[in-house]
Amino acid sequence: MAGDVDDVKGLADAGGRLTRRRLLAGSLAVPIAVPLVGCATADPATAVVEQATKVDAKAPRRFRIAFGSCAKQSKPQPIWRAIGAAKPDLFVFLGDNLYADARDEATLRQRYAEFMAVEPLQAFRRSTRHVAIWDDHDFGDDDEGADYPLKQLSQQLFCDAWNEPADSPRRRADGIYQSYVYEAFGRRIQVILPDLRFNRTMLTADPSLKSSYAAMVLRAKLSGQPMTGWYVPDTRPGATLLGETQWAWLEEQLRVPADVRLIGSSVQFAADGSGWEGWANFPRERARLVELIRTTRAEGVVFLSGDMHYAEMSSIDVAGGYPLWDATSSGLTEVWDIPTPNRNRRSAVMAELNFGLLDVEPVTEGEDDLRLRFALCDVNGKAKVTKELTLSGLRFPEKEKTA
């Protein structure tokens, strides 16, 4: 067992109280469901506080998170060997964990059955603690959002496939958003998984840009120029990614005590100018999240994202705040090798099969600061893109804190 209820009794919600619920049995960990007392939502998804596996005294003092996205169930998936060899304490599935692309119930059910039959993936799941969110293809179909007609069925199929109990809030909320907290070497690492599909407003496409997809690809390959998508920012006040209920939930999550906060976004948060899916298509929503991070004084926020079929690091500089970094890892089976614009790109683009690693560890023994080591790795586990951050660099300036 990884711990008991008393291991986390010091954690409090936004209302200053921690309601301890029943232990959920598991061979790898002991999760504890923590309802957000006083949350503005009527039926919020719960946060889950989970004691990380005790680390041997001779082992490195770190918490290792692996992450990835975009695994087509009809293709070989050899990458799980390398991910397993990295021995992560947690794997975060960032969406497109299967490709349903379904317009009818029978197809949707069949695709989930195919996903459950991918033995390398399922064997990895049996051996490694993991959490998951969906993107469009496992939600239902390409680029779908709130109008997808099978979303309630998809919600239940997702919960079945990812072993959510019958009374899980993910089965009854307006989406599958969920949050977790892990404790390692006396520090708290929070993983927040917003649902960017269930309530998302229909995307806005520029008719002058939207042409035959095959023709766009051919032009890009022949010209050697970056290929920009056809989606444009929707600046209408009502356009949303999350919906108001989920926004209230997210605010509560950002107030939960944590040292490092990883927001698992199924689409890129920091990228700008690609013309494909991302928070950039909803500039009011992205600005709202930046402001929410500021008003809740949530420090140590970093984004993990998927979707793009390549890997890279991006960031947004926030006036009066700290840089918001976005580590994109995609895909586990899918590769896009045509250059795509991104004004906020901060690394080389890794256009090959990949997964991400993040080691959270003390900078030096006895100090308060933490080091966040990112590595975007190939199918053999070799790091191709790396980035190192410190928790001290993910904090508000002192004058901002006291303003």
Feature annotation, model-predicted:
Residues 1-18, 26-34:
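N-terminal secretory signal peptides
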Residues 37-38:
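C-terminal motif of bacterial Sec signal peptides marking the signal peptidase cleavage site
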Residues 20, 25, 41-403:
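Metal-dependent phosphoester/phosphodiester hydrolase catalytic core
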